[in-house]
């Protein structure tokens, strides 16, 4: 599904966007934002984030740098020397990073 959506966005970027000229008020552009949102969050949340972004992109809307948000913050638990459990909020971009951090913390 993500692959098909990405294909349509690339088609827009190559065939339609050059005819319209630069109109996006944000960096990255709305179409680039959509590609990044799909890659980072998958089809459902990526479409939701992209739709919200496109709705904000109008003459009376905001402008400037507006990156795709990171994935949700996950909590991991680990034990310190005093045997009390402490929770740490760590943003994970992928499972490998989470696994490496979990192995490091014990």
Swiss-Prot record:
**Primary subcellular site in the record, as a coarse category:** membrane
The keyword Hydrolase is annotated on this UniProt entry: no
Per UniProt, the keywords (alphabetical) are: Cell inner membrane, Cell membrane, Membrane
Would the keyword Cell inner membrane turn up in this protein's UniProt record? yes
InterPro entries, alphabetized: Membr_insert_effic_factor_YidD (IPR002696)
Subcellular compartments: Cell inner membrane
The record ties this protein, via Pfam families, to: YidD
| GO cellular component terms, semicolon-separated | plasma membrane
Membrane topology per record: Peripheral membrane protein
* NCBIfam families for this protein: membrane protein insertion efficiency factor YidD (TIGR00278)
Family listed: Belongs to the UPF0161 family.
What role does this protein play?
Could be involved in insertion of integral membrane proteins into the membrane.
**Designated name of the protein:** Putative membrane protein insertion efficiency factor
Q: Which source organism?
A: Acinetobacter baumannii (strain SDF)
């Amino acid at each position: 599904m993500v692959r098909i959506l990405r294909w349509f966005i690339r088609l827009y970027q190559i065939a339609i966007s050059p005819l319209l000229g630069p109109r996006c008020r944000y960096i990255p552009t709305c179409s680039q934002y959509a590609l990044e949102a799909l890659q980072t969050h998958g089809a459902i949340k990526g479409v939701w984030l992209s739709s919200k972004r496109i709705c904000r992109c109008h003459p009376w809307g905001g402008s400037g740098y507006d990156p795709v948000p990171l994935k949700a913050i996950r909590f991991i638990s680990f034990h310190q020397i005093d045997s009390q459990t402490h929770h740490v909020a760590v943003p994970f971009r992928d499972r490998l990073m989470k696994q490496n951090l979990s192995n490091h913390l014990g």
